[in-house]
């Protein structure tokens, strides 16, 4: 009992004692490519054999020239963080690619621990059309920030219709520049992207700093938050005491009279901490109870490293089943 009480208090205190997220973050831009950026540019599939070797695999990020340019920006702006950008496109399309965000963090992020080399956290990535949802998940795992720049918009005619070019594609107009080497300010309190001196508001970035995402950033990654919530809930339920959560409340989206998709039905049936009778719809952000863990197209040694980092000997003693598919990275399995 004392152990459970101590665990519940320790989880709450260890989180609340963490430093708050910096109100202002200075960044210097680096355009990685124009158009959508596939995660294969960040971590090529033909280099999958080296993904568990962080130092070696980091050498395949984009190109050797790009790596040199990023290093030059870091030397020119030692007090700023490099923000990797997909100009006129979306960052991270195609897959979640944990090794991709690992590489971005290695070159542009912060060292997680001075005792563990080549493992970095807190990268900052951006795209004119934002971050691919599946890639945003892995950005959150590293405590990173994903920015929807909206720096190009469709040019409209007098009737409000997009003006097309000779290829029948919409003509775009630039609302502000993120040319490589541009210094910008991210205000995490007002949730705005500003000019270097903070005088001009460029775009609202509230979607990048929801209460849940702010927790991930503050904790240096989503794993610590998820595990903390699980342990605190378990301790309180076992002791029969009220949960005094230090974490952001769940986001519950409920639309009266609206039916449920198949996925929403499964989600509702397994939601944790939701009042009886509450029906949740898309956009909700709550914990769920799972009994099957699946991982598609997985690099086996990376999974082993993740489990080691969690001090885990098994995937979970509570799930009914777990699987991994090797897919095109099967060659790295022993």
Explain the meaning of each model-derived region.
Residues 38-43, 47-59, 64-65, 69-82, ...:
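Long, structured ligand/cofactor-binding scaffold of large enzymes
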Residues 38, 46, 50, 65, ...:
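Structural signal for hydrophobic packing residues in well-ordered secondary-structure cores
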Residues 256-280:
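N-terminal basic/disordered segments at the start of proteins
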Residues 7, 41-194, 201-208:
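Feature captures the catalytic cores and cofactor-binding loops of soluble hydro-lyases/lyases
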């Amino acid at each position: 009992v004392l152990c459970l009480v101590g665990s519940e208090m320790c989880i709450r205190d260890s989180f609340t004692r963490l430093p708050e997220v910096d109100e202002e973050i200075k960044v210097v831009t680096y355009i990685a490519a124009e158009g959508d950026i596939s995660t294969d540019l960040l971590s090529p599939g033909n280099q999958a054999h080296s993904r568990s070797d962080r130092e070696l695999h980091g050498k395949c990020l984009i190109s050797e020239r790009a790596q040199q340019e990023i290093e030059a920006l870091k030397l020119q702006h030692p007090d700023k963080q490099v923000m990797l950008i997909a100009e006129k496109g979306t960052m991270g399309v195609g897959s979640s690619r944990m090794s991709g965000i690992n590489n971005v963090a290695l070159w542009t992020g912060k060292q997680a621990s001075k005792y563990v080399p080549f493992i970095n956290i807190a990268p900052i990535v951006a795209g004119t059309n934002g971050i691919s949802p599946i890639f945003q998940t892995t950005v959150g795992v590293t405590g990173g920030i994903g920015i929807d720049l909206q720096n190009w918009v469709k040019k409209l005619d007098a009737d409000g219709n997009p003006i097309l070019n000779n290829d029948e594609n919409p003509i775009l107009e630039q609302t502000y520049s993120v040319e490589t080497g541009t210094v910008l300010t991210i205000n995490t309190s007002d949730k705005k992207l500003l000019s270097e001196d903070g005088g001009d508001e460029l775009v609202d970035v509230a979607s990048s700093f929801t209460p849940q995402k702010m927790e991930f950033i503050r904790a240096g990654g989503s794993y610590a938050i998820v595990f903390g919530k699980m342990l605190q809930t378990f301790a309180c339920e076992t002791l029969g005491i009220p949960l005094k959560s230090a974490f952001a409340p769940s986001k519950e989206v409920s639309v009266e009279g609206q039916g449920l998709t198949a996925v929403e039905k499964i989600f509702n049936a397994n939601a944790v901490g939701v009042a009886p009778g509450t029906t949740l719809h898309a956009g909700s952000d709550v914990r769920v109870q799972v009994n099957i863990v699946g991982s598609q197209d997985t690099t086996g040694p990376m999974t082993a490293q993740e489990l080691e980092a969690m001090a885990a000997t098994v995937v979970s003693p509570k799930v009914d089943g777990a699987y991994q598919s090797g897919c095109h990275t099967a060659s790295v399995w022993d």
